[in-house]
Design a protein with these regions (language model features):
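Conserved beta-hairpin
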Residues: 1-32, 36-39
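Acidic, Ser/Thr- and proline-rich intrinsically disordered linker/docking segments
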Residues: 23-29, 36-118
Length: 118
């Protein structure tokens, strides 16, 4: 499962194993200064918007890859059901990152602390 962490002043979305192939993408790195909000959601599927292009998807099972629409682009790394972290960005290739995490609350809290968001 993908991991969100902070390394050298950047937010990094580490994709593991097959996720890189499923999402047609490598790790994503953005400056911490580009993070405008971090929140936890119970239903990551409700957060997905636009069409998947490119990526892999099967409703309620997996959504990994770029999502495109009038809003621009989001990147999703969603597996199964359960909590996720939604990171809203500005001035980067992606408008949002949507990532499932068993410990979504702790991940979001850590990211908020690193970015100075409350």
């Amino acid at each position: 499962m993908a991991d969100l962490c902070v390394e050298d002043g950047e937010l990094v979305l580490h994709l593991h194993g097959m996720e890189k192939a499923e999402g047609f993408h490598g790790d994503i790195r953005v400056p911490l200064s580009s993070v405008s909000a971090v929140r936890v959601v119970e239903d990551p599927w409700a957060e997905l918007r636009g069409i998947r292009a490119p990526g892999t998807g099967l409703p309620d099972v997996i959504a990994v890859g770029t999502r495109r629409g009038a809003f621009g682009k989001d990147f999703a790394a969603v597996h199964g059901k359960g909590p996720a972290v939604v990171v809203e960005l500005h001035g980067t290739e992606y408008a949002r990152l949507v990532v499932t995490a068993d410990n979504a609350g702790a991940v979001a809290s850590s990211l908020r602390g690193a970015t100075g968001l409350s």
